[in-house]
Structure formats: structure tokens, C-alpha cells
């Protein structure tokens, strides 16, 4: 039984699935549909989404298309990279970090337009349904959420196509067959899942990779770049100041040309199952290496190690959809505080899939060459001081060793 809904804001891509959802909302809920399409840097022309929505009966004033690339990178990607966040040691969270922004924009439009519901196209098996809906409820606790994939009976590609034809929804010729895999993309990354990728024992076909050339085909000469940071955020490449989105776009181009950022992994979804994904994050891979490089000379050991302890929890919160939670905000405050002196330049070598930091400098560097040199310096390190340091740190180990020997006698 459909709930009483007057207006719904749909996260709309213009593709087959969300176009079917649009019409399904109209026919099932008899409600007014408002579409929101975000330009997150996915590399697609978005005007066709406007035309498709118009064709399906959406009024011009109910069609929202917004370029959110700068906001996405500055307010979501960069804060995450200050934490060096990776999920399960590998995944750079490219899909996860985009969902809170989409949810936020939908809620803003719902308030502006007086809508009482929001809707998304995430399936009932994946993480995205959780990410979207946790965002909705955090920002608008009483909002009605419609998740068509959990409600309708269009459970196969054939049924979707039949519904589309029944309701005169245009279908591109290349969309009539079963897609070999599903793709999600934004300025940070692209992800490919399903179908030909479902067997984790099988190598991903080369045609799956759209954002990077293979490392084997990359140039035989390395590319050397310098990235400047200011308080933990990248601000320039090779001396040229760039906006956040422009900088990430440039890093993507450099990474693509050098075969950088490919990742094939099996991850643990929040909903309980394991899934295999193929990810391409060329610019993000470079950015992470460079950020860790500048932190290596500007962060105190205790702060650096604490950050590394906090990072897995922070990454898990983002992966699971808790961007708007108080615990994520608490961790963010600590992480941001740690970046006060993370300013300087990092030189990186890009070569056949590898990202190597080869130089780093900062006006706030904690690296003291006179302390680490093997030569005698003005600030000499007295080697004899180490004896007492070792003796004190060995005290508990010697005590434990003595007990173990007594027990064994």
C-alpha cells in the first residue's frame, strides 16, 4: 500500500533505472516528482537528464541540475584525505564519500520545494541505500523515504525494460542488453561491480578499466610533479595554484597517463555480505601518497601514530554512511587540528602504476638533519644517552623474563 506522498525529490541520473523509478513514483504514489541531478565530475553530459525528465512529464521548475564538483572536493574529499582514510587498508572510499552530499542536496531541495519525501535508486543489497537514508534522516528526521528497489516487483532487467516500453520511456540501444557490469563514477574515482566481476578468482577484463591505462602501457619515462599543501589540503601542482576540483582533475589526468590508481578487491559490505569491486582512483592515489609524505616531516610521532589509530574507525564511519554522525565530526575536529602545520611541498614520481615520494620540504619541518647525520654536528647526539633509555624501556621485559624463567625451572 503506497503511503500518502505529495511531493518527492528523486536522485536522478537520467539513466534507465532512475527513469523507470521516476515513472513508477508517478504511477504508484500519484505524487509530484522533483528530480535532482548532481554533477560530481562523473564525466557525463547532464543536459540529457533534463530532456529525459521533461519527456517524462517533469515541469522545468521541478528539474534541478547542479555542478557540485568544487563543493564535493573541498568539503568532502579533502577533509577525508586529511585523515589518510582507506577502508580495509585499500579502498579510498570514492563512492561512499559522494553519497552524503547528494543526500544533503536532496533535503535542501525538499525544504525549498515543500516536498515531504525523497527517493533514491540504490538496490536492497548494497551499501548505498544505507548511506543515502542515514543522510536523509540525520538532516530531516521526519522525512519519508521511498526506496523503490525494496518495494516494487521489477526484479529483473526484462521487467524493467517491459515497464519502460509500457510507459514510453526511451531506451538507448546499448541499454537493451544486460550490462556486463555496473559503474559508478565521480571526480574521485570510478567503481565497477557485478556480472563479469562477480567471480573473485577471475581477472577483471581490461575493458572494465575506463580511467587508467594499464601500467604495462604507461610511458617508459617517469613523470615528476610537485604538490603544494596548505594546512593539509593540496593547493597547487608544479607551482600553479588550482581550485580543489581543478587540482583533482589534473591529478586524475596525470594518474591516468601513468597507469596509477587501479584496485581490485573483495570488501566487507555494511549489510553483511562480501563483494568484489574494481576501482580506479588515479588522482586520489597520488594525493594520498603526497599527503602522507608532507605529514612525515610535519607531524610529531605521537600525533602521527594517533592519527593512524583513528583512521580505520573514521574510514569505517564514512563507508557505513555515518558522515553526519557526531562521532565522525569529533574525529574530524581532531584530524583537522593535526593539520595546522601540514604545509609545504612534496615531489612525487609517477611511473608505470607506482607513486613514489622522492622529496618533501616544509617551513614547519620537524626533521633535523644535524640530529640524524652520522657526522659530528653542532647539535651532537650523545650515543651514551641511549643506554639509559634502553635500560628503562627494558625493565618490564626483564621482569617478565625473570618470571618466565622461574616458572620453567
Curated annotation (Swiss-Prot):
Biological processes, Gene Ontology terms: argininosuccinate metabolic process; L-arginine biosynthetic process; urea cycle
EC number: 6.3.4.5
Disulfide bonds: none
Record-listed L-citrulline binding positions: 91, 96, 127, 131, 182, 191, 267, 279
KW rRNA-binding (keyword) present: no
MF terms in GO: argininosuccinate synthase activity; ATP binding
Entries under InterPro entries matching the protein: Arginosuc_syn_C (IPR048268), Arginosuc_syn_N (IPR048267), Arginosuc_synth (IPR001518), Arginosuc_synth_CS (IPR018223), Arginosuc_synth_type_1_subfam (IPR023434), AS_cat/multimer_dom_body (IPR024074), Rossmann-like_a/b/a_fold (IPR014729)
Pfam family, one: Arginosuc_syn_C
Catalytic activity, reaction form: L-citrulline + L-aspartate + ATP = 2-(N(omega)-L-arginino)succinate + AMP + diphosphate + H(+)
Complex formation: Homotetramer.
Family: Belongs to the argininosuccinate synthase family. Type 1 subfamily.
PANTHER family: ARGININOSUCCINATE SYNTHASE
Protein name: Argininosuccinate synthase
UniProt organism field: Xanthobacter autotrophicus (strain ATCC BAA-1158 / Py2)
Amino acid at each position: 500500500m503506497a503511503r500518502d506522498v505529495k511531493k518527492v525529490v528523486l536522485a536522478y541520473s537520467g539513466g534507465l533505472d532512475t527513469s523507470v523509478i521516476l515513472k513508477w513514483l508517478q504511477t504508484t504514489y500519484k505524487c509530484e516528482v522533483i528530480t535532482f541531478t548532481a554533477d560530481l565530475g562523473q564525466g557525463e553530459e547532464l543536459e540529457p537528464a533534463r530532456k529525459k525528465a521533461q519527456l517524462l512529464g517533469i515541469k522545468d521548475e521541478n528539474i534541478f541540475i547542479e555542478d557540485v564538483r568544487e563543493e564535493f572536493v573541498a568539503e568532502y574529499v579533502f577533509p577525508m584525505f586529511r585523515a589518510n582514510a582507506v577502508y580495509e587498508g585499500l579502498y579510498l572510499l570514492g563512492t561512499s564519500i559522494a553519497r552524503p552530499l547528494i543526500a544533503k542536496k536532496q533535503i535542501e531541495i525538499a525544504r525549498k520545494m515543500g516536498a515531504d519525501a525523497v527517493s533514491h535508486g540504490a538496490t536492497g543489497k548494497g551499501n548505498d541505500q544505507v548511506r543515502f537514508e542515514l543522510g536523509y534522516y540525520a538532516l530531516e528526521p521526519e522525512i519519508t523515504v521511498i526506496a523503490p528497489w525494496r518495494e516494487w516487483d521489477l526484479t529483473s532487467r526484462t521487467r524493467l525494460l517491459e515497464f519502460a516500453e509500457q510507459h514510453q520511456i526511451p531506451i538507448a540501444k546499448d541499454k537493451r542488453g544486460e550490462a556486463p557490469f555496473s559503474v559508478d563514477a565521480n571526480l574521485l574515482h570510478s567503481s565497477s561491480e557485478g556480472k563479469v566481476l562477480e567471480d573473485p578468482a577471475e581477472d577483471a577484463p581490461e575493458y572494465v578499466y575506463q580511467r587508467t591505462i594499464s601500467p604495462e602501457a604507461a610511458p617508459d619515462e617517469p613523470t615528476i610533479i610537485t604538490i603544494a599543501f596548505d594546512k593539509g589540503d593540496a593547493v597547487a601542482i608544479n607551482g600553479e595554484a588550482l581550485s580543489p576540483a581543478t587540482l583533482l582533475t589534473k591529478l586524475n589526468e596525470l594518474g591516468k597517463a601513468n597507469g596509477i590508481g587501479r584496485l581490485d578487491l573483495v570488501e566487507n559490505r555494511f549489510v553483511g555480505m562480501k563483494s568484489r569491486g574494481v576501482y580506479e582512483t588515479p588522482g586520489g592515489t597520488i594525493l594520498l601518497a603526497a599527503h602522507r609524505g608532507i605529514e612525515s616531516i610535519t607531524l610529531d610521532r605521537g600525533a602521527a601514530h594517533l592519527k593512524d589509530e583513528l583512521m580505520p574507525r573514521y574510514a569505517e564511519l564514512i563507508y557505513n554512511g555515518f558522515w553526519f554522525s557526531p562521532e565522525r565530526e569529533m574525529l574530524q575536529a581532531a584530524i583537522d587540528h593535526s593539520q595546522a602545520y601540514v604545509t609545504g611541498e612534496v615531489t612525487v614520481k609517477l611511473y608505470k602504476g607506482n607513486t613514489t615520494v622522492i622529496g618533501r620540504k616544509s617551513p614547519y619541518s620537524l626533521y633535523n638533519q644535524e640530529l640524524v647525520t652520522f657526522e659530528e654536528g653542532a647539535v651532537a647526539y650523545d650515543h651514551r644517552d641511549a643506554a639509559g633509555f634502553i635500560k628503562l624501556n627494558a625493565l618490564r621485559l626483564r621482569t617478565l623474563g625473570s618470571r618466565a624463567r622461574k616458572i620453567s625451572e
